[in-house]
UniProtKB/Swiss-Prot annotation:
GO annotation terms (biological process): L-threonine catabolic process to glycine; protein tetramerization
Keyword Glycoprotein among UniProt keywords: no
InterPro entries (UniProt xref): ADH-like_C, ADH-like_N, ADH_Zn_CS, GroES-like_sf, L-Threonine_3-DHase, NAD(P)-bd_dom_sf, PKS_ER, Zn_alcohol_dh
Residue ranges crossing the lipid bilayer per the database entry: none
Originating organism: Pyrococcus abyssi (strain GE5 / Orsay)
A cellular-component GO term for this protein: cytoplasm
Protein name listed in UniProt: L-threonine 3-dehydrogenase
Oligomer status and interactors: Homotetramer.
Location relative to the cell: Cytoplasm
Active site: T44 (charge relay system), H47 (charge relay system)
Length: 348
């Protein structure tokens, strides 16, 4: 193994990133070193690349970017048990304390002292990465690396879609970005019908169809609520899944969901949102879930089994694959332009 490696690094507090050569890290106690096979770009990585307000408040350059990964364990640090060299793995990004009130109740996904791998630590946009052993997930060999690297965001989609019953339910999904597309795949694999998708981008509406959406709506040109009511015989949808983070989409979805329906919110909003709680939530007796992270480790088992079942249609979602990191700038600019689904760097 070489002593040097290539990595995409946020080298300074400004727009962009650099491809640099750095030392291969050594795993310490409770850590493992993985050789990266595949790694994918998340919206969080794009925020860091763009150096937006959130990134400026959280990221401390210089730092290796990236957190979605599939790789092979090549070295095990002192004190690590149950993980061996050669294991094919992915990584849960929430590094939890195990001691706070939430953790002691088994609610690790809302740990009050969470650190994010690849945000608060060096990440996986590199040929090798050091990972906390407690965050390692072993993958079945049957799952290809370009799918295995998507398990972390896929877990977000699974928790959003499966927060309540979904089989045989009518569904509205607002936002067909990468997470929304994963949500479509999970909803279809889980027996939802019809799956209606509201998305302003022509490119992403076409992707939504390829993934399995039964109906697509352009909210800039069509009346979303009217279209949903027409499709559902005036009843509204049983389940509303909000992936966009657009306040207008939230309002439209709450109007379009049937009384006593279920709402799952994953999209993050730019600020405070004004909602008619009385008429859109309380008097409709809606059940509303806020979704963050993934349930550890229940969601990972669900994700892995869905992938192994062969029922998830993910190929249309992976719109771009790059061999290595050389074209990382092109990849990020395409994402900024909204012209991608998931972007995957393949290192093997």
């Amino acid at each position: 193994m070489s002593e040097k490696m290539v990595a995409i690094m946020k080298t300074k507090p400004a727009y962009g990133a650099e491809l640099v050569e750095v030392d291969v890290p050594k795993p310490g106690p409770g850590e493992v070193l993985i050789k990266v096979i595949a790694t994918s770009i998340c919206g969080t990585d794009l925020h860091i690349y763009e150096w937006n307000e959130w990134a400026q408040s959280r990221i401390k350059p210089p730092q290796i970017m990236g957190h979605e990964v599939a790789g092979e364990v090549v070295e095990v640090g002192p004190g690590v048990e149950g993980i061996e060299v050669g294991d094919y793995v992915s990584v849960e990004t929430h590094i939890v304390c195990g001691k706070c009130y939430a953790c002691r109740r088994g609610q690790y996904h809302v740990c009050q002292n969470t650190k994010i791998f690849g945000v608060d630590t060096d990440g996986v946009f590199a040929e090798y990465a050091v990972v906390p052993a407690q965050n390692v997930w072993k993958n079945p060999k049957s799952i290809p690396p370009e799918y295995a690297t998507l398990q972390e965001p896929l877990g977000n989609a699974v928790d959003t879609v499966l927060a309540g019953p979904i089989s045989g339910k009518s569904v509205l999904i607002t936002g067909a970005g990468p997470l929304g597309l994963l949500g479509i795949a999970v909803a279809k694999a889980s027996g939802a019908y019809p799956v209606i998708v509201s998305e302003p981008s022509d490119f992403r509406r076409e992707l939504a169809k390829k993934v399995g959406a039964d109906y697509v709506i352009n909210p800039f040109e069509e009346d979303v609520v009217k279209e949903v009511m027409d499709i559902t015989d005036g009843n509204g949808v049983d389940v509303f899944l909000e992936f966009s983070g657009a306040p207008k989409a939230l309002e439209q979805g709450l109007q379009a969901v049937t009384p006593a329906g279920r709402v799952s919110l994953l999209g993050l909003y730019p600020g405070k949102v004004s909602i008619d709680f009385n008429n859109l939530i309380i008097f409709k007796a809606l059940t509303v879930y806020g979704i963050t992270g993934r349930h550890l480790w229940e969601t990972w088992y669900t994700v892995s089994r869905l992938l192994q079942s062969g029922k998830l249609n993910l190929d249309p979602i992976i719109t771009h694959k790059y061999k290595g990191f050389d074209k990382y700038e092109e990849a990020f600019e395409l994402m900024r332009a909204g012209k991608t689904g998931k972007v995957v760097f393949m290192l093997k």
